[in-house]
Amino acid sequence: MNRCVLFDTETTGLDPELGDRVIEVAALELVNDLPTGRHFHALVDPERDVPEEATRIHGFTAAHLTGKPKFADIAGGLVEFFADARLIAHNAAFDFRFLDAEFGRLGRAVLDQARMIDTLALAKKRFPGMPNSLDALCRRFAIDLSQRKTHNALLDCQLLAKVYVELIGGRQHGLVLATIGPSTPIEIYTRVGSRTIRVLTPGAAEIAAHQAMLTRLRDPIWAMD
């Protein structure tokens, strides 16, 4: 079983080293590159203000987040959901930095960079020089964006799961892996018995008729020098 976890965060800003915090985290389980329906989602009280420019991106204000769990309250569940899976994110370095900062505040181990799969890097390799934001990729792959009014970690995970499948080979990739299993009936065809091949040879009359037809041909190609 190939298990990956695709995840996304929303934050109060762009730099955890300047005190920006995670306000939302969502994760979605993939097995053989297809969603299983299992997911993790939490809104988080950042224990600080939410700048207006950040609110314009994700729609959350400090009032929305007051009383929500603190990151310390959800960290254990998130780590358990991640387990030892490969971790997929769009512009993954950004999300890794923020989670590492949150884990570091709690004295927890940071994420192993070797587990990172960055869909932005995959997209840039496949579509060099083209826009490769999540919105741009959804439009390129004809993925419905009608519900994406603001950035929302859980919805973005669901959209990114569809984008990821397209980036690694399209909807059929993983489908075969998911549908063929131990219970799938397999038909095996074997040859039954032996078969004698009949060789048909022309009779004297048929040979004579064929020769007569050849003599009526004008300038046959095989007679040319």
What are the language-model segments listed below?
Residues 1-114, 124-128, 136-151, 224:
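Conserved non-catalytic scaffold segment of RNase H-like nuclease domains
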Residues 102-105, 163-170:
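Active-site catalytic microenvironments for nucleophilic, acid-base chemistry
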Residues 118-124, 183-187:
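Short, flexible loop segments at boundaries between secondary-structure elements
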Residues 121-124, 139, 162-165:
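Generic alpha-helical structural context detector
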Residues 152-167:
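Acidic, divalent-metal-coordinating active-site segment for phosphoryl/phosphodiester hydrolysis
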Residues 166-225:
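Acidic two-metal-ion nuclease catalytic site recognized across multiple nuclease folds
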